[in-house]
């Protein structure tokens, strides 16, 4: 059974952090990068307190406040987040993300510190690869290959 730890290297490459006191424009600058779909917001101790997505930035800009981008990150971040741990099965994370229509989620360690960001495409790819491998093993078993 595949677990989040199996795709953690890819998740680490897209991890982007800001402090909850950082201005929103810092998160916006990060989100310009197509490989950074989410910015994790941390407190002074490095513990996750929320996330900022491109949608959060668009909602802020829709308010058309002139000082919107200088607001603190914690003013616009999403506080109720779906996160996962490295030991969790990929299928479980996939189902939770689909239930909430999410494309990505932060991976946290046991103390709530961010380790990476898993993306739905990574989960789908790993799960498909696992199923394909199982099908090949089953086919070989049925055909008697390697069991003679």
Regions found by a protein language model. Give the residues of each.
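Tandem CBS (Cystathionine beta-synthase) repeat/Bateman regulatory domains
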Residues: 1-148
